[in-house]
Design a protein with these regions (language model features):
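Conserved, well-structured interaction surfaces
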Residues: 9, 17-22, 46-126, 138-150, ...
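Membrane-proximal, proline-rich intrinsically disordered regions
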Residues: 1-35
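General structural signal for secondary-structure boundaries
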Residues: 1-5, 100, 144, 173-180
Length: 181
């Protein structure tokens, strides 16, 4: 599969396209509709939806409500997509397809940074999350919130200084995450 630089970007971009989906929809309902600043009034027979909006408003949701399920699945799906892309790209000989080892390291650090993002969001929504380092890890128990926080911190402290620097505002970029300092 890895026969050109474009094929590495196809794998690198998958966790980022998942992120684009992830940042909207169900997360909005959990973080905005559950506050006093938003409301979702019932209009006729079509807005009740089995009481899911009511449960959000009154903070009586259950683990089976779609917003919770989709958020958990989206969070863990983002983590798994990033870990899978990382495993795939770590096995690629970048020099053989015309890319440098520095580009490879940058790609891996971008994936570590987005993995940290998904763990950070999971920590916000659910507290401690099971921590995985590889797609080959077996099922893991839930880690504590502190362990999850430390995992996020480690990923970011290692990734951010090693990311390629942002060269100019608004210019075309190679990759998805740049160090903007």
């Amino acid at each position: 599969f890895f026969t050109s630089p474009e094929s590495t970007y196809a794998v690198l971009c998958r966790p980022f396209t998942h992120w684009k989906w992830y940042i909207g929809a169900d997360r909005w309902y959990l973080q905005e509709l559950t506050t006093d600043e938003m409301t979702c009034p019932k209009r006729g027979a079509d807005w009740y939806n089995g009481g899911e909006y009511y449960r959000l408003h009154y903070h009586t949701w259950s683990p089976d409500d779609r917003f919770v399920v989709n958020t958990y699945d989206g969070t863990t799906g983002g983590i798994s997509r990033a870990l899978e892309a990382k495993a795939d790209l770590e096995g690629v000989d970048y020099n053989a397809i015309g890319l440098s080892d520095a580009v490879k390291a940058d790609h891996i650090n971008q994936l570590n940074a987005i993995t940290a993002y998904f763990y950070m969001k999971g920590l916000d929504y659910f507290g401690g999350m099971p921590i995985y380092h590889s797609v080959n890890d077996g099922l893991r128990p839930r880690n504590t919130a502190l362990e999850t926080y430390r995992h996020v911190e480690t990923l970011l402290k290692n990734a951010i200084p090693a990311l390629a620097k942002k060269s100019s505002l608004g210019a075309p970029e190679d990759g998805y995450i740049k160090q903007a300092a």
